[in-house]
Amino acid sequence: MKAVLENNVIAESNDIVERGGYHYFPSSAVRLEWLEKAPKTDKDRECPHGVQFYDVVIGGVRHPRNAWVYEAPRPAMEPVGGRFGFWEDVQVG
């Protein structure tokens, strides 16, 4: 499975976990050099799973908050802890 943004493969792996309609990739499968931590919002701080959003930056073009990872997931979301999910701007398939 691949995560693609504007013809750029951000992540690729067969080791995918699906939760809530989103596909989560292991960090080892993600082009981390294209991700920059986004500043946390009040809503982010309220998330019970310790969410951290990332901007995807490719070729100097910033796509704000298009990726996220749960840093401290509660039991129901533990299988996706430390894995990256992507918003609808990113095609996953």
Regions from the PLM with identified roles:
Residues 1-93:
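Terminal leader/tail segments of proteins
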